[in-house]
A protein has these predicted regions:
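Terminal helix-turn-helix DNA-binding modules in bacterial transcription factors
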Residues: 83-128, 144-147
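All-alpha amphipathic helical-bundle segments outside canonical DNA-binding/catalytic cores
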Residues: 7-19, 40
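Basic, amphipathic alpha-helical hairpins
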Residues: 2-11, 25-35, 50-62, 80-85, ...
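Append "Primarily bacterial transcriptional regulators
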Residues: 65-72, 77, 81, 115-122, ...
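Short acidic alpha-helical/loop segments enriched in Asp/Glu that coordinate divalent cations
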Residues: 35-42, 63-65
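N-terminal positioning helix adjacent to the helix-turn-helix/winged-helix DNA-binding module
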Residues: 20, 41-49, 85, 93-97
Length: 147
């Protein structure tokens, strides 16, 4: 297209060159408009994901749950979260979860089993492994350290 525009200018087909230039401007304006709409959509999806995580992380931490609620693919959701935060959607949910777990362990006398059930972990063992992976210590060690 650029080659055709240059040729038109050189061969003094000024009217053709003007039309080609206008076509190029229109093309790039439409492309920019599309990119802006996509960016806005991605921001909306990310904001809704964050809201949903705050509402549901205690009962559901699976990416398909969130992508289904947002009517997007799990990959698309993960790409957006990674673009916005630098971490995966799973990591985002895990970080939200560990904040709550730490708060419950340090500010309540609830048993660790009760906390794991309240946070909807399938078992005490799964909760313990999750907590250790996220913090480097067991729930008991964390509680003792923060008391």
């Amino acid at each position: 297209l650029l080659h055709t525009v240059r040729s038109s200018f050189k061969s003094s087909h000024l009217e053709s060159a003007k039309h080609l230039t206008m076509s190029m401007l229109y093309f790039y304006a439409r492309k920019l408009e599309h990119l802006e709409k996509d960016k806005k959509k991605r921001e909306i999806v990310f904001d809704r994901f964050c809201d949903d995580v705050r509402k549901f992380y205690k009962i559901n931490r699976s990416i398909p749950f969130y992508s289904g609620r947002l009517a997007v693919s799990s990959k698309y959701l993960n790409d957006i979260v990674k673009e916005k935060t630098g971490i995966t959607a799973n990591e985002y949910i895990d970080r939200q979860t560990i904040i709550e777990c730490k708060a419950l362990l340090s500010s309540t006398d609830m048993s660790i089993l009760k906390i794991s059930l309240m946070m909807h972990f399938p078992s005490y063992s799964v909760f313990g492994k999750f907590f250790k992976r996220m913090t480097g210590m067991t729930p008991t060690e964390y509680r003792e350290k923060t008391k």
